[in-house]
Amino acid sequence: MKHTHAQLNLDSLKLGKAQKKKEDNLMKQLRSSMQLLRNCLFQNEECKMAALKAHLVPVLHSLWPWFLTDNSSMQIALHLLCVYTANYPTGCASLCWASGGQSSLPSARSSAGNSLMHSILKLASQLSNDNSPIQQVVFCLLSNLALSHDCKSIIQKSNFLQNFLSLSLPKGGHKNPSSVSTLWLKLLLNISFGEDGQQMMMKINGFLDQIVEMCEYKHKSSQHLALLILHNICFSPTNKPKILANDKAIAVLSACLESDSCAVQRIGAASLWALLHNYQKAKVTLKNPSIRRRIDEAYSLVKKTNTQPEDELHAYYLKCLENIVQLLD
């Protein structure tokens, strides 16, 4: 791949049809190399470490201008990065280094916006409502990277998440989200697994209202993702006052207790328990008669339900409701 990059740069200085054909052949060769490397890296940490030491990220970064002119090569490069970063935090962090991943020293971290991570965010911003194959892969890659503290920090500083607010949400009773919405929800869910991500999202003006609206989707998979994000942000002490001040958010969470879906019931109960935990002011909001009625009815119903002792999810739901009732009493 390094050799191909050098050849591409040398040959780009020449003109003519023969030169164009040679360039096409080099790009074809590059695509084959990336596909082969992707297969070698799949679920293989030893190979990923070897790729890190061989400076895979700086090589891809140097080839980035060529990828931008060729969608097929860009898609394969992004697929390669998806495989490389999956369950490999060191690999994720290497995308943030200004040197292109050749050093793990903090001084090499990128602050000037010249890392591969910045280039990926720029590409994703340009495609934010596109729903092309490249957009799907770039969001898949960002979902991997969002689990890394270093990458999350660059996402925050880049203001990339502001693009979430420009999503056009479907109107009307039977709401079905666009596939772009689902890509965003999967990314945001991964960001919400850490408290830094939970706070980062709540700093975006209008974020909570948008997520709450997406919790009302009829499409079960997307609704579930949105509810999980809302559930996760309830665990941050900094976020609790804002969530409790949002009547619609509390209405959505309490309505979960009346859902036909056991998974949705659990999300609602766990979220309400999280809001109450170590936060006295939450009691005032959750003692609202209509919310309290839903809690008491759900608790009464779950105590009557006969389940197997090994049903851990049911036991967790019961524990959530027991703690909510105890804290409110």
Stretches with model-predicted labels:
Residues M1, K48-M49:
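Alpha-helical solenoid scaffolds in large eukaryotic transport, assembly, and signaling factors
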Residues M1-T4, N9, K14-A18, L37, ...:
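Buried hydrophobic core positions in alpha-solenoid tandem helical repeats
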Residues L10-L13, K21-F42, M49, K53-A54, ...:
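Alpha-helical solenoid repeats of the armadillo/HEAT superfamily
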Residues E45-E46, S62, D196, D209, ...:
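Positions in alpha-helical segments
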Residues K53-V59, S99-G101, N159-N163, G206:
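Amphipathic alpha-helical scaffolding segments
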Residues V59-H61, N87-T90, C151:
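Long all-alpha helical scaffold domains
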